Amino acid sequence: MIEILDQNRLEVFVNDVFWHTISKCKGVAFKGDLVSDLGLDSLEILDLASEFHFRFDMLSGEKEFYLLQYKTAELWKEYILKAANDPSKRFGFFTSGSSGKPKEILHDKHLLIQERDFWIDFTKAKGVVCLVPVRHIYGFIWGLLLGSRLKQAKFLGPNEWHKVSDVASENDVIVGHPVAWQQISAPFPHRFAISSTAPINRKLTEKLRSKNIKGINVYGSTETGAIAYQAWENEHFKLLPYWQKQGIKLNRAQKNYSI
């Protein structure tokens, strides 16, 4: 079986979801007995299991992975990893809820892998520095899927963004959003920067470019993944090669595209 998500990146994702779902455990590693070590009650365990069941499509198909029969975080992670690397299952995400209640979105893995492989070819990245939450599709694709493929990924929270110039290697892609870019003042020249989730100010991109930082804005959504990108020095967006415009509609090609 081809590895889609490796153990190291899985740990990052599981902890992110754990802290987001069980706020009292923020900063506590997901390990040990769920009750005696992590202090979870039955409702918290049910909430957390439901979250992982959805995000890894664990209860669908011929192979079901029902987490509530296991009492330790290690066994949960063992079966989450199996589901993550089962090509017949999907990855689940929640929309931001900006237009109402957050919606559940499930993506076939081969489509996310298609996007991962495009970005690796496009950026020529050797590693990733991720400044965005990995539970959202943007951070998941760039931080976890690219990171698992490249075997080189670093993850910085908001209180660590100032370290980016210290941890980024020359061939790393730095994945952020406008808020992160506004707060990063130290130069990190000759890196490739990615921005998404919201429009980025032109003056800010000009400032970053003056420090020899190349970058692009990525346009997309939880429902679609990335659709188009815009180089910081350009005015217009360019469709990713597997998106095809037909009239006023966009259709995604499954295969047979070239960069």
Tell what function each PLM region has.
Residues 239, 248-259:
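Conserved ATP/PPi-binding loop(s) of AMP-dependent carboxylate-activating enzymes
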Residues 31-32, 124-128, 190:
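Phosphate-coordination loops involved in phosphoryl transfer and adenosine-cofactor binding
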Residues 81-94, 124-127, 213:
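Conserved pre-ATP/AMP-binding loop-to-beta segment of ANL
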